[in-house]
Amino acid sequence: MAPPSQDVLKEIFNLYDEELDGKIDGTQVGDVARAAGLKPTQAMVTKAAGQEFKRKGEKRLTFEEWLPMYEQLAKEKEQGTYADFYEGLKVFDKEETGKILAAELRHILLALGERLSADEADELLKGVEDGEGMVKYEDFIKKVLAGPFPDQD
């Protein structure tokens, strides 16, 4: 898949411009890159930005300031393929049913690797747990890799 043109990147960037001033919040650097098709970790975003933006309102960035960060992220080896996630979660599927306990998956998201907040984990797990408290991890991985859909419930 060809990378998006600069015009398309600008359109994506503008979708995140909440104050309509031609800028995004520094905390959105990774979100905009992900909306443009990249899959950077938070560590990669911090490295590309040269700093970590922890608080909303701390710094606002123009498209011209964001674009080099995006370009650096685009050069990085793509992180976390479907096969990587599948093999990682399969380890927890003791009965080889294609499912793991939702509580165990939540614990994994909160405690291992690049840890999520409780709210982030809950958002990812929304709608994937079956009536028995299990998650079909193949469907979960596909949902995660499909990208962020911030306004979709």
Curated annotation (Swiss-Prot):
GO terms for molecular function: calcium ion binding. Pfam families: EF-hand_8 (PF13833). Residues 4-39, 80-115 form the EF-hand domain. Keywords: Motor protein, Myosin, Repeat. Signal peptide: none annotated. The keyword DNA repair does not apply. One of its GO terms (cellular component) is muscle myosin complex. Myosin is a hexamer of 2 heavy chains and 4 light chains (two regulatory light chains and two essential light chains). This is Myosin, essential light chain. The lineage of its organism: Eukaryota, Metazoa, Ecdysozoa, Nematoda, Chromadorea. The gene is mlc-3.
